[in-house]
């Protein structure tokens, strides 16, 4: 493959911006960019001349990004095979701006070797220049906006990355931001919270949104597309991101196209600093690349048993979900968990959590009524080696009982929609008011609630007059507020109401909630919680940025990151690194299977939601355990201590959970057995033969009567693979992966010898990526450390570098 010439943007008309660009052109002379090749040899691309018809190639792992002379992406090439993965007939600039509410596209692009910078420029109409610094990393490349130059009077509102139109959609990891087939994977990852991994609701026409399949996995909980880098389309897939400028007051559209006023934030909230990573990879190396990106770019990197949570078996571990967990019974609950081989107790407490109210998240009496009381509960469970988790409702602010955020006087930082002034005075007893604008009462926000000063007022009818809007059917003094008179001209704001009919915290409150959730981990010792209802942080108008601010802010407030499980109601690209898993419940097993297809596509652990075992037969409980073994999926076993303490079958239930979960976590079931367990028409029972080592698996009918002969289930003897690693080529990107035959592996370590200089070994995934600098034979020993009582595995490998 050869590089076509690259334009230097010559021939633009004279002007201030043109002179700036020409001054910069002196350090943009011809430069060789190396497109990292396959093991058979590196491919090099050279800028040969400066014509407008040129093409620039930029390596990003095994992906070669081809830009034409205008800065449009015209090639997405697997540099190993030469195959172009761009969707035929589709291309957009890598970077575009929205200036003065008009889409502005570059007319040229230039590379500067002095600072590794791509300059996207346009001197016609809305003149601008965007500098993007490109850095080659280990298997990926980063792209960061370092400068935006335009007319000082212009309003740079949004920066758009792509979308990159990809021709394949065999597997689309929406939240992970990865599109792949059996041969190649292409990924885009936002590298900070301000770079939102999604597409702005305001510009569907610029991002092929009409072609997007909103819910390709048929998730019942919701479509994940509004918060996702990757989206499946009718012709392939797109990878996209954007950054909104919040240095000025903005309006952002919610899911119902309602405009929500936001900001302004500080001067750092411009589009400068928007940053993404791009990469192409063999499919089996994607988790290794994502691990290197997270660790190399200072993204959240939670671990389970010291292993990155995205590849840790412990991320999919089961728990006991006990509706009546409290300080009096936690000791017995922990002993039950021990008997079942379960490490986590979880308090859902009416699907809200053990709180006096949501918002400030102070513990209620079930957890001792204070942080100190809750800490004692946690310590009691810890004596049995069991950790405690709690349910939260993210930035839902409860109004019954009222949280201090809504108690008079209500916090001014509650999330609000549009505003308009009173056009007439309002008395404290009136059931009608008049507005000088329509925005506060237009459709598009849950419920019909207004805020005037510190009073919350609901309404049920709106009628347009000649110069004002009549709002009637008022119910005064809602949410514990006090009816009050208000003068003409007083602002009236629409209140953004959550799906539980309470308030939602705005950005300042979101930050405080994140700090509070950090405290319950650091001080109290809580090690597991769910961000239920987290879409509310997006409904504030802040979109993915709002969700990331809460979830990643909570992570930042933690003083330790090992062994903490976080679940979510929405899996988003910007919070993917922090979140351990989703665990969506449903009574329909087909839906749970579909959920797990989504989890697998996004490198998330298998989960089967909460499963209420109260009063169920042992056969029905084992049937769900069999499905969990088939999918390698954890389960939230929901019940009450009242039931477990009174039921005669409790010891048998606990033992069955222990046997199935132990065998699952060791990888004891064969692929053939897992396929049989997946069949929803079947029921099974599992009995221990040698504790922790072997079991007898028996198919049964609905009454528990055996069908056919029993099968042997055995813990695997740990082994490493493959037997031989591929040959490497000096100066060319190399990728390989050491694997084990058990999910119980928690660490890969080079215990003797060493890799070729330039290669990096990932201890969490077993992946090897890099560009070897020297020829020769390099021999080393890899040791896999295993959990669950399994022996460690060792193998000696040699990499030949030619």
Predicted regions mapped to residue ranges:
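Active-site-proximal substrate-binding groove within the catalytic cores of carbohydrate-active enzymes
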Residues: 547-715
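Solvent-exposed loop segments of extracellular immunoglobulin-like
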Residues: 743-750
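C-terminal edge beta-strand
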Residues: 789-802
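Aromatic-lined carbohydrate-binding/catalytic grooves of carbohydrate-active enzymes
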Residues: 308-309, 313-417, 496-518, 524-541, ...
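Autoprocessing Asn-cyclization modules and mimics
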Residues: 394-483
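Carbohydrate-recognition beta-sandwich/jelly-roll modules
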Residues: 57-349, 380, 387-388, 527-528, ...
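Strand-loop-strand motifs at the edges of beta-sheets in extracellular beta-sandwich domains
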Residues: 757-773, 781
